[in-house]
Amino acid sequence: MDKLLIAVLGHRNSGKTTTWTSLFERTVKTGKSLRRLYLNEKEYVVVFLISGSPEEREKDVEELITVENPAIVLCSTQYRTDVMETYDYFINNGYSIFVHWLNPGYNDSDLVYFDSLGLTPRLLGNGATLTIHNGKENPEFRVQELREYIYGWAKYRDLILSD
């Protein structure tokens, strides 16, 4: 698969936006065009960002993607019953999926919560990679994990660009 979804999953106010802010090293919002994501001082990939989750916005993810067939999509996803519709869109459109689950999230209790929606077997059964991180902790190390994953995936597909 030559398309990648990096999803940050969590409850409302779990740290999804903080993750994107840390990854881009600045405040970012959903845009209408592709943007550069620097993976180090000189190398970058071109990505499409959906910062506010489709679930919170009450919109289908395809309504939020305003460019044709982006190779890399970064998308916030909210842990609620309709989130699988968002993942199904990416599965049905040939995306490899990496899910960065904030569990517990920043505003959750201190305990990891049970996957009551059954997302784990559905995602893993469709070949997704799933990691779980504490959204209450400093995002530096988990964001570095995202950066390294994107770099490796993009390098293999010759999608790394440089200034």
Task: Name every feature range the model reports, one short phrase each.
Residues 28-29, 155:
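A generic secondary-structure boundary signal that marks alpha-helix termini
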Residues 11, 54, 104-105:
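Generic structural motif
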Residues 3-25:
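Glycine-rich phosphate-binding P-loop
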Residues 1-3, 70, 94-96:
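A general structural motif
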Residues 29-92:
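Conserved nucleotide-sensing/catalytic segment adjacent to the nucleotide-binding pocket
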Residues 16, 53-57, 138-146:
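Phosphate/oxyanion-binding active-site loops and adjacent basic polyanion-contact surfaces
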